[in-house]
């Protein structure tokens, strides 16, 4: 800059704030607030003790505030120009979009008809329900910890147990061999009960079967022919107009 340059508006505000004559900074080669903040606060005060005196610190603080504001405005304008330039490259405002698929859109009332009956309570909002049931938290944590490794829990146990494996011969069956197979299955304890629970679907009296699996004491499947009853006992939501096959093949246990 040269002496013919005028003081910037931001620096003029600093002059007004500290009550010095207009253009006084320019006499000392300060034409903008950036000329001031190029120096540290201490350097500026020491270099200008003769004329602003005790107001030098306040002048530097005001100049720093103005400089920060100008930087923010400059960056904001840059970002605005970039966004506008990007939008101009995609001038389509939606008028060219096809409306042929609008008729096939399912509204929220169809997708979640149960929303209208839900209560806004703490359990409904904050209760965490696993997406895969039955769920076992400790087993899930172990599986997650081994997710990015090349070894399974069975492999880790086999390397650390001196009597592994227990199921090499028929004579080594028992609790230990069952434990080994449980580890190898990679199923949680709740999942392991599904294939090992007693089969109660082949009895002559199926009351116990329906009581255990569908929560209704009945000797046959006829109560579940009513869709509302079937959906309620399974805790499922049926969309409006939906149907569930509740004939013999759906509700009667396979023999």
UniProtKB/Swiss-Prot annotation:
InterPro entries hit by this protein: Insecticidal_toxin/plasmid_vir, Sal_SpvA
Highest taxon listed in the record's lineage: Bacteria
UniProt keyword annotations, A-Z: Plasmid, Virulence
Keyword Glycoprotein set for record: no
Keyword Transmembrane: no
Function: Not known. This protein is involved in the virulence of salmonellas.
Family: Belongs to the SpvA family.
Protein name in the entry: 28.1 kDa virulence protein
Gene of this entry: spvA
């Amino acid at each position: 800059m040269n002496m013919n340059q005028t003081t910037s508006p931001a620096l003029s505000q600093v002059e007004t704030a500290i009550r010095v004559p207009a253009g006084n900074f320019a006499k000392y080669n300060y034409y903008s607030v950036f000329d001031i903040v190029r120096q540290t606060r201490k350097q500026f005060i020491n270099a200008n003790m003769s004329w602003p005196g005790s107001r030098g610190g306040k002048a530097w603080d005001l100049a720093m505030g103005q400089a920060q504001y100008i930087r923010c405005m400059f960056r904001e304008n840059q970002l605005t120009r970039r966004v506008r330039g990007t939008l101009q490259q995609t001038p389509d405002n939606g008028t060219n979009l096809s409306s042929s698929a609008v008729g096939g859109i399912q509204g929220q009332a169809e997708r979640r008809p149960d929303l209208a009956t839900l209560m806004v309570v703490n359990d409904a909002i904050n209760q965490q329900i696993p997406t895969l049931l039955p769920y076992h938290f400790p087993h899930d944590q172990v599986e997650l910890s081994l997710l990015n490794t090349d070894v399974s829990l069975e492999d880790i146990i086999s390397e650390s147990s001196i009597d592994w494996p227990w199921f090499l011969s028929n004579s080594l069956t028992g609790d230990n061999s069952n434990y080994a197979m449980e580890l190898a299955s990679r199923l949680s304890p709740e999942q392991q009960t599904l294939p090992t629970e007693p089969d109660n679907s082949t009895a002559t009296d199926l009351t116990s079967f329906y009581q255990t699996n569908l929560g209704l004491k009945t000797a046959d499947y006829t109560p579940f022919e009513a869709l509302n009853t079937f959906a309620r006992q399974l805790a499922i939501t049926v969309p409006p107009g939906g149907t569930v096959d509740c004939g013999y093949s759906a509700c009667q246990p396979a023999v």
